[in-house]
């Protein structure tokens, strides 16, 4: 499986421009099986959305499914959505989708909302972990601030996974934390880790990216150039992952609680 990571310069509150940019990447990547996008990849990190600024969940799903089926590529990324089916208020979510060309739509609502940035005022938190099984690989979906909470991302028998995906708008001033935490999550969970971060500028922060794929040993398998929009790709070797876990069964000794 070829997985491509898009380090995107997100146009602020301009979904049309961002969808066009995503589609151009799909056009240029015909051999990619899965394209991973950053957090809130069609709006930028908007914490207190005004009326009409967000798409409905149904509209986002329709667009992602159309792109996935048109290009034969699965898509994963986070979107700020209105969802009137949510039981809590506000009826908005920072929602990470995983949409396949076969027509399957999975989503995870960000659990750890970014309190210092006011995200909890504009969105409702999700409460369930989401693991997606696709083409024989198990993906755990996470969003940005979740990365700081290792218990939430812990591999266990109820939530086993092979690849952890973290999509983000992680600011430049905390770049070292991003780099370090991604590698730590890979090592401690004996898993591949994908971190996709944006570049550019919004009303609050600047972003340098640091988009990468990390081996369970902690070394890099693919990296985008810091500060530049672009795509990097890798192919996870599942046989070697399984052999590593069998020969060095750290996960079986993990704390239960």
Residue ranges of model-derived segments:
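Active-site-proximal beta-strand elements of phosphoester/diester hydrolases
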Residues: 1-10, 14, 107-109, 137-146, ...
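Hydrophobic residues at beta-strand termini and immediately following loops
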Residues: 6, 108, 132, 196, ...
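CN hydrolase (nitrilase-like) catalytic-core segments centered on the catalytic cysteine
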Residues: 57-76, 148-229
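Active-site catalytic loop in hydrolytic enzyme cores
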Residues: 87-159, 173-180, 243-250
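Binuclear metal-dependent phosphoesterase catalytic core
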Residues: 219-245
